[in-house]
Design a protein with these regions (language model features):
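N-terminal secretory signal peptides and thylakoid transit peptides that target proteins
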Residues: 1-15
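C-terminal segment of classical bacterial N-terminal signal peptides
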Residues: 19-24
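Extracytoplasmic/lumenal soluble domains of exported proteins with redox or metal-associated functions
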Residues: 26-134
């Protein structure tokens, strides 16, 4: 059930991700397209994030802590073609695994924020900003 508390937390999460997206997009000089919005469906905050992501037109992917199926059936296939940014609200251990897998696709965690009073973090995995030489 989505109550006022979880709705406010989802707003906080939704507010965090665009800042990272805008900063990355400004550095890359092109809009950042989110390939997947990953959320842990065991948590109301994760489900609220998924609803917000769907409202933005993002494709969502639910997990229950384990990212194996997501990796094997979706991300691995797409990341073989090249980088595809993903955003999410998961537990830290799920992010840890996704972060390591993203390295092989040339991506890094570019935004990470712990959610207050939750065992969750919001994050963005995307290609790192291009370095500008002076």
């Amino acid at each position: 059930m989505v109550d006022r508390r979880n709705l406010l937390k989802a707003g906080l999460v939704a507010g965090i991700l665009p800042l990272g997206s805008l900063a990355s997009a400004a550095r890359a000089a092109e809009p950042l397209q989110i390939h997947r919005a990953v959320y842990d469906s065991r948590f109301a905050t994760g489900r609220a994030f998924a609803a917000e992501a769907q409202a933005r037109g993002w494709t969502t992917a639910a997990i229950e802590g384990d990212v194996t199926q997501l990796w094997y059936h979706q991300l691995n296939l797409r990341w073989r073609e090249g980088p595809a940014p993903i955003a999410g609200v998961t537990q830290e251990n799920s992010l840890f695994v996704l972060e390591r897998l993203a390295w092989d696709a040339g991506m890094r965690v570019t935004t990470r924020a712990a959610l207050p009073h939750e065992p969750l973090v919001s994050w963005l995995i995307a290609p790192p900003a291009r370095r500008i030489r002076a």
